Amino acid sequence: MQCDFRVHQDARLARVYYFTEVWWMFIFKFLEPKMLINSVLFLAIWSSSFAEESSSSDATSNKRAAMGFQDMRGNKNLIPTSLEHNKLSKRTLMDFQDNKDSNAPDIEDNLSHEFEKRAPMGFQGMRGKKGYLTPDFEDSYFRDEKRAPMGFQGMRGKKVVSDDDYYKRAPMGFQGMRGKKSLEEVLGEIEKKAAMDYYDTRDKKTYVFEYPEDYEKRLLASIRGKLKEFPMEWEKRAPMGFQGMRGKKSLLDEIEELEKRTIMGFQGMRGKKNALENYIDYYLDPDMDFDKRAPMGFQGMRGKKDSDKRAPMGFQGMRGKRNTGQRFDTGINFNIRSSNEYQGTNNRRNALASCQLEKRSPFRYFEMRGKKNPRWELRGMFVGVRGKKWATAPYEDDSPFISVFDNTERIGVDGDSPAILGNSIS
């Protein structure tokens, strides 16, 4: 753009020179000497004024940006849009409008070194980099000058370090901060502050005048001499007020809470009981129930159930082994013993044995998980329950007992029946 403008100026100067030459030739041929002098003066004045006008136009074109205000945030697109083309066509001459499309890359190259992202002077508080006119050694000086030297300093940035009289916490009041404080330090601070009537901390509002004048004196009179009355554990926290800070709890309070807890009620907590006491009780009396939990309350936790809490009769088909020696005698008559318990219970609740034999399931139902106590009429019909088979060690010498178990496989095959087997035994 600048090159085309200069070419256009050169064309205008060529026209002016041609016009002046023609004018001189006309003067020398047709005018008198007086008029010759006047015409020479006129041409000199006119040419000088034209030269000044052309130089001023060059200066203004160099000082001013090519188009538009370019002080906005971010980079501007150097390729001219349709609106910028229209504005440019109004400002430039008619000769320049014919070549505006072909001169777009030349405009971008010529203005790239003049186009800056920010204004060269004035306020530079926009987003982006700092001004290049500011030297490095003056950065610290300008940084300190940007914030207020006094007053409210709650802005973003660093605080002024020169304020030595500025305290970070209140001189009195709530002392529930993190950490431990000695009682002697607290009382010493109160005594020092009570000697002064007014605390001037940078013209801050204090609440001294809201209380009576002799309030602190009466407070000190009530506190002095009572340091030894406090227990030693109070030295680690504030003497009064909210004490919910981090630290240890009083041992007496913990003992009181333990006494209030687990006296009665729900005792279904996981844990072990004192193994020594249980072992001694079991060693002295093995038949006694081995209690693993508190004697009362809800006891639905993991582990064994108390024998008093078990169902005294009913279906006992739990997984496990049954003690055949406790259930039947080793004799031929298969007398039913009084105990109806599992292995290791040693004949408990003998009085309930007769009732347990009457509460069994009806005939011909043997499909449940576990073992039932069958009646004598059906004792040889179904043996396929979970668990081990009948033990043979105590009955090796009893030939009728062995023959009964040998004939169980032939029931219903050769016309045998439980009655026939019973007659053969008797």
From Swiss-Prot:
Compartments reported by the entry: Secreted
Annotated tissue distribution: Tachykinins (TK) are expressed throughout the nervous system. APMGFQGMR-amide is also expressed in the retrocerebral complex (at protein level).
GO biological process, one term: neuropeptide signaling pathway
Gene Ontology CC entries for this record: extracellular region
Segments of this protein annotated with the region Disordered: 299-329
Keyword terms, alphabetized: Amidation, Cleavage on pair of basic residues, Neuropeptide, Secreted
Biological role: Tachykinins are active peptides which excite neurons, evoke behavioral responses, are potent vasodilators and secretagogues, and contract (directly or indirectly) many smooth muscles.
Protein name, entry field: Tachykinins
Organism: Camponotus floridanus
Phylogenetic placement of the source organism: Eukaryota, Metazoa, Ecdysozoa, Arthropoda, Hexapoda
